[in-house]
Amino acid sequence: MVLMCKCILYPRCKLFVTSGGKEQAAGIVKEKVQEICTLIPAFKNEIDWGRGVTLEGKDYCKYVFKNGSYFDNIAARESSRGKRRHGGLIEECVGVDGTILSEVIIPTMNVSRMCMDGSTHPEEQLNKSQIYVTTAGWKNTFPYDKLIQLLVW
């Protein structure tokens, strides 16, 4: 729901969801979008459901909003290297390899969103925004270390 709100409030933003597996991320996203659109029909009206615009497949989904924003799922693998997004959500980060996250996923967020007037604002809250969602893990794992880093930082 957070990504949907960001897509509505920030035109032309590009966001992503990733997880340990690409199919897992796509399944989570599709399930939650359908649930939210059922509970709050206004969200369904903001998504462009036109043919070939919003895509839903077995291991990929992309939701395009009427203001040009979108969010999709990307794989937590080397094949995602070089993609560019403004922010993202790491779902079940306990299952994501810390090296891949640091070297491939986080660098995808190195671009600033272009506003409707064509300007960019590097200090904008959306840029490089990271949301981590996971179940309880163990000490000395990447998610635990990341939590401590964010709490202390």
Language model features: what each stretch is:
Residues 1-153:
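Phosphate/NTP-binding elements of NTP-utilizing enzymes
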